[in-house]
Design a protein with these regions (language model features):
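Short helix-capping and inter-helix turn/linker motifs at the boundaries of alpha-helical repeat units
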Residues: 15-18, 106, 151-156, 200
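Non-catalytic DNA-recognition/assembly elements of restriction-modification systems
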Residues: 21-51, 167, 171, 175, ...
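Sequence-specific dsDNA recognition surfaces
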Residues: 23-24, 37-88, 234, 240-256
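Short, ligand-facing micro-motifs at secondary-structure edges
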Residues: 49-72, 91-115, 126, 130, ...
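Ligand-binding loop in jelly-roll beta-barrel domains
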Residues: 120-125
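Amphipathic alpha-helical coiled-coil/heptad-repeat segments
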Residues: 1-17, 168-256
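A short glycine-rich beta-alpha junction/loop motif
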Residues: 96, 110-115, 149-175
């Protein structure tokens, strides 16, 4: 539901409106007042200096930015050549896992690998991030790119990313759409978290019951086991061959 909601609202908006054909070939139509352009006119790619004591950040396939343990700048050899700086609020686009939705706005200062495009945006970063994720959910990246390994899309070239087409409304409407999608995402994530917690509690309860029975903490000597009747499953009879000799004999007897 989350992916379908994102895909719908970033291409249709919140209100019903007149639609028009689009030059973006993976979209059938867009709201008539929306503009179309290439990403390079909305995003600016940066090569930032690495902050002191920067933590290594991962632009994950789950669509968020995570800290990678205790990996510090001082523990990484030749880090100036390998990594790049990230500022809180930067839009990150993973050049190899774009197809899987590895696109996110960083909540941290830190550093990341150069395969990730670190960008700022002159529009709503949240709207653009959701739009780019929509392209992953609808498999656009897989259709327009050949990965260098299985299950990848190769967007390491910034020119390839910069020339992707996007349709977008006014900045105010972008923020409204992003706010609405944020609400859906938060609601779904809370629901999933609640279910995961309930499942974990049931697993713990099951393990506790088993352990209590095995250790004797629960006395099961007087537990009544209900009677049941064992029913042996019969093997299915083999179907007779059509046109067998027995069938022919029966036919001849009927004719006689």
């Amino acid at each position: 539901y989350k992916e379908s909601a994102i895909s719908y609202y970033v291409t249709h908006g919140l209100a019903e409106t007149e639609m028009r054909p689009t030059e973006i070939y993976w979209l059938h139509e867009v709201p008539k007042d929306w503009k179309e352009t290439k990403l390079k006119y909305l995003l600016q790619k940066h090569k930032r200096e690495i902050p002191e004591d920067a933590e290594l950040l991962i632009c994950s396939n789950s669509g968020d930015v995570k800290k990678r343990g205790d990996s510090k700048l001082g523990l990484v050899a030749s880090s100036d050549d390998i990594y790049q700086g990230v500022h809180k609020g930067d839009l990150l686009i993973h050049g190899m896992d774009t197809w899987h939705g590895a696109i996110a706005i960083s909540e941290f200062d830190g550093m990341c690998t150069p395969v990730v495009h670190v960008c700022t945006c002159n529009q709503s970063k949240r709207f653009v991030a959701y739009y780019l994720k929509m392209m992953a959910y609808t498999k656009v990246y897989k259709a327009i790119s050949n990965g260098v390994r299985q299950n990848t899309s190769d967007f390491r070239s910034w020119d390839k990313v910069a020339n992707l087409l996007i349709a977008f409304p006014s900045l105010a409407e972008q923020e409204e759409i992003a706010d609405y999608i944020d609400g859906i995402v938060d609601s779904v994530n809370r629901m999933v978290s609640d279910y995961e917690m309930q499942i974990e509690q049931l697993h713990e309860m099951k393990h506790r019951v088993i352990l209590d029975v095995i250790t004797g903490a629960t006395d099961i000597r007087n537990v009544q086991i209900p009677d049941y009747e064992f029913v042996d499953e019969e093997e299915p009879e083999e179907d007779s061959d059509i046109g067998s000799d027995s069938d022919e004999d029966e036919t001849e007897e009927q004719e006689d």
